[in-house]
Curated annotation (Swiss-Prot):
Coiled coil: none annotated. This is Large ribosomal subunit protein bL27. GO terms for cellular component: cytosolic large ribosomal subunit. The keyword Metal-binding does not apply. Pfam families: Ribosomal_L27.
Amino acid sequence: MAHKKGASSSRNGRDSNPKYLGVKRFGGQVVKAGEIIVRQRGTKFHPGLNVGRGGDDTLFALSAGTVEFGRTRNRKTVSIVPAEA
């Protein structure tokens, strides 16, 4: 049996907290203004029509409507199709 802990075992044992990233509202879902659509690191999804981007690259709805995922050139985009009044 070893009487010392070993070179690295006492330096291990940490884990970061979960960040809860990902798509929060899927295509076809109805959203209100200000609702978060995607939480992400970097721009995996780019903002489209009626979608804003926060400082941490979070995409959120600027107006009420239906979420729509699509492609523009080689980018994945998220747009909001306004609800017809």
